[in-house]
């Protein structure tokens, strides 16, 4: 029975958040409590940036991860988990509604996909969090060497 539950969990984990919760309930799977979605943000969803309102009720913690952040020429960055740059961001702890809103904003799954990464919290500690990764980097995407979207936008990085 335990194997069957694990198989079902794997089959529904890639559904959008609200559909996943509904499927978990209908299948009788253990449901994670609301507000347990950790998401690493590195661009316009950061505190004070243009799209922060999409997750205004999420708890925010300063954090970093390794990878590569790109300027793609359209007012928002892209992230690739491959790379060794210290990428500055925040880990948001979001409820189902905020998580679904972020999925819509990011064009999940058409424009961006979600991947789990390891994030390091300011002040210590490490968490696993989702990150939005662009499915295909546009031609001309340029790595942001400083790894910090805000500094890059201000011309400091």
Language model features: what each stretch is:
Residues 2-157:
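Glycine-aromatic micro-motifs
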């Amino acid at each position: 029975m335990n194997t069957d539950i694990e198989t079902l969990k794997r089959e529904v984990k890639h559904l959008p958040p609200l559909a996943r919760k509904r499927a978990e309930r209908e299948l009788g799977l253990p449901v994670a409590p609301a507000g347990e979605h950790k998401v690493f943000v590195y661009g316009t969803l950061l505190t004070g940036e243009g799209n922060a309102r999409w997750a205004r009720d999420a708890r925010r913690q300063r954090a970093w991860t390794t990878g590569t952040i790109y300027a793609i020429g359209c007012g928002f960055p892209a992230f690739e988990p491959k790379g060794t740059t210290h990428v500055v961001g925040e880990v948001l702890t979001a409820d189902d509604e905020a998580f679904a809103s972020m999925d819509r904003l990011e064009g999940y799954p058409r424009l961006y996909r979600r991947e789990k990464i390891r994030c390091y919290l300011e002040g210590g500690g490490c968490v696993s969090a989702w990150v939005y990764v662009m499915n295909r980097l546009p031609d001309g995407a340029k790595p942001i060497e400083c790894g910090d979207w805000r500094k890059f936008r201000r011309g400091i990085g």
